[in-house]
Amino acid sequence: MTSLTLPDIAAQKHQHATPLAWVGMCGIALPVHFDGRSVAAMADAGVSLEDGSSRGIHMSRLYLSLERLERQSLTPLAIRQILADFLASHEGLSHAAYLRLTFDHLLKRPALVSPLAGWKSYSITVDAKIENGMFHVELSVRVPYSSTCPCSAALARQLIQQQFQADFSGQAINREAVLEWLGSSHGIVATPHSQRSLAEVNVRLGDRLEVLPVTELIDRIEASLGTAVQTAVKRADEQAFALANGQNLMFCEDAARRLHQALQQMDWAKAFKLRVEHAESLHAHDAVAASQWQW
C-alpha cells in the first residue's frame, strides 16, 4: 500500500484574505480540578485569526492544551498558561486567545438554627483572555435568594391593624386575648408576597490573585442580602428564615444597591457588574435592577 501524507487543509492559503475575531470550539466536556475535587465543566476555547490568508486554525491543538486542567488545579496561573499555549501553537496566525469555563460549584450550607446541613449548587463561569499581551480573568456567579416586597408588607400590616381595630374596638385590652389573636389566622389576615430571586454577579479579577475566589464571592453576596435560600430545614429554621425575610424587605433596587456596596469592598475586584431578578409572585413579569462599577 502506498504511503501518503495526510492533507492539512487548515494550512492552505485562502483566496479571500479576511481576518476573523474568534475561531474555536464551544461546548467541550472537560473534568477540571477545583477546590480540592474534580468537577464536570464545559469549555469554549478559541483564538483570533489575524492571518486572513490562512484557511483556518488548528483546533486540535486548542483541545489538547485543555488537558492541563485534568492534571492541575484551576487557578489564574493555570488558565494563563493554557492561553499562552493557544498562542504558541498558533504563532503567526493569532494574537489573542480566549477561554470560557462553566461548571457548578457545590457548597454544604448549615441550617439557620438546627444542626442540619445540605448541599447547594452555584452556577459558575470563568472568562479569560490574552489580548494585546494583557491577561484578563472575569468570574461570574449566580446566587439565588428570597425577597419580600416592602410595599406588600406595609399593606399586610395595615390590614392586620384594621382587623385588630374591628375585633377589639370598645373592649378592654386583655394581654392573653391579644396573644391568642396574634397567633391566629383570624388575626393575621394578610401576609406579604415574596419570591425566589436571583443575583448574577460578574467580577473582573485583579492581576495578582493566586486562586479563583468563588466561595468568598458567594459568601459576600449571600451575607449582603441576608436571605439565602436554604437546604435541609426544621421548623425552627423555617421560622428563622421568615424572620430574616421580615428584617430584609427588598425591592429589586434595594437588593442591587446592597450588592453594589458589598462588592466595592472587595480589594481583589478591578471592576464588576451585577443584575438582580425578582420573579414576582404578584405579577406575571419579573422585576429587574442592574448596576456596575468601573466596567
UniProtKB/Swiss-Prot annotation:
Keywords: Hydrolase. The record marks 149 as: May be catalytically important. Pfam families: GCHY-1. One of its GO terms (biological process) is tetrahydrofolate biosynthetic process. It is an enzyme of class 3 (hydrolase). Gene3D superfamilies: Urate Oxidase. Its EC number is 3.5.4.16. InterPro entries: GTP_cyclohydrolase_FolE2, GTP_cyclohydrolase_FolE2/MptA. Pathway: Cofactor biosynthesis; 7,8-dihydroneopterin triphosphate biosynthesis; 7,8-dihydroneopterin triphosphate from GTP: step 1/1. It catalyses: GTP + H2O = 7,8-dihydroneopterin 3'-triphosphate + formate + H(+). GO terms for molecular function: GTP cyclohydrolase I activity. Converts GTP to 7,8-dihydroneopterin triphosphate. Belongs to the GTP cyclohydrolase IV family. NCBIfam families: PRK13674.1-1. This is GTP cyclohydrolase FolE2. It comes from Pseudomonas putida (strain W619).
